[in-house]
Amino acid sequence: KRLNKVLTYINNTDKLVDVGCDHGYLAIEAINKGVKLVQLVDNKTMPLDCAKHNLEKLNRLQDVEVIFTLASGLTKIDDRINVATICGMGGDLIAQIIEESFVKAKALDSLILQANTKVEHLRLYLINKGFTIIDESFIKDKNKYYPIIVAKYSGAVSKLTSTQIKYGPIILIKKEDDFIDYLNDRLVHLNNILYHT
């Protein structure tokens, strides 16, 4: 479900880099969607080898350019790349990846980010560094909740309230079902604390 949601933010004309490529599943689905240039980046050889193995099974590779890169974050991305996905990491690590390659990050058309932890830290970093949050989603996947942030550099420092930083300015507007479920779960949890302590 998370993967499918991330894919909705990728167009078939995009040139994609997937940072922290895991098994290459996102790249495979992006290629199936029509993306013609995919770069998979990881700082460990095992995930890259696993991704290579999985991508070799694809029939459509003859008209697709796939680049495998052993590197940290966005440091060695191809100059043609216009969209980056950085998913399944802590928000502090995602912020660090962007900071380490700030010039490259701000030149991209969009950063599609999915942090497992420290999402508030990531939002604060983005807005303080001149990135605008252009879209967000909130997904429940295998009984865990995940916000997805789409950001683009604008140079403008956005002003967000503490509630917007905590939950996401666009997530609060969209009020998706999974977000409502999350708030209800939190309410039950907080009530349990209140009445059992």
Q: What are these regions, as identified by a protein language model?
A:
Residues 1-14:
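Conserved alpha-helix/loop element of class I SAM-dependent methyltransferases that forms part
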Residues 13-22:
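Conserved class I S-adenosyl-L-methionine
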Residues 37-42:
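Conserved SAM-binding motif I beta-strand of class I
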Residues 46:
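Conserved Rossmann-like nucleotide-cofactor binding loop
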Residues 76, 92-197:
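Class I S-adenosyl-L-methionine
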